[in-house]
Amino acid sequence: LSFPTMELYAMPAATAALLDDAAVDIDRWIGEEVEQAFATQEGAAFVNGDGVAKPKGFMTYPKVDESAFAWGSVGTVASGADGGFVDGEAADALIDLVYALKAGYRQNASFVMNRRTQAAVRKLKDEDGNYLWLPPASAGARATLMGFPLVEAEEMPDIAAASCAIAFGDFQRFYLVVDRQGVRVLRDPYTAKPYVLFYTTKRVGGGIQDFDAAKLLEFSA
């Protein structure tokens, strides 16, 4: 397996006086802010990265209908209608998606979608009028859909004709994140006096390692 990597870079600055006088730990605060910025960029790359000097996102691999699935592509299951679900048959489409996944992967599987898709899914009901989406059963737990947890990823596409807006699978087995060295911080008090520069870098890569471990719901007939 070979996965492309990217280097994330940031160089926040603070005055030496602020670092000396601040009531809070400025070094730690800057580190946390940079980590958050890096995490946002990583999340986008893991979903939609083109693999050119960055991770290859799982949505950029070839997609093929599950009936013609072959290693090296991501299998898709049709929702039954362009840009949505067939009226009254949303649960059937989700069941087809769940059982497109082999049993060994379903145990730790979850749904992944963005917040707009999740808002639409939360309104789905079964034939008895019960919501398919269920709130967390306890503090710290996740909401579930069809008995599986949901993960929100803003980088996933919206529901639209031919879009693959919902992913389902065991993502720990599906997608490998390569973290080369963690975050490195070089503190530079000389180059831009009176500012102290925090030269911050991180190398990260990623790509699909097991094409059997996740499937996509394609909103098509």
Which stretches of residues belong to each language-model region?
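Structured, hydrophobic secondary-structure cores that serve as assembly/anchoring elements
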Residues: 1-221
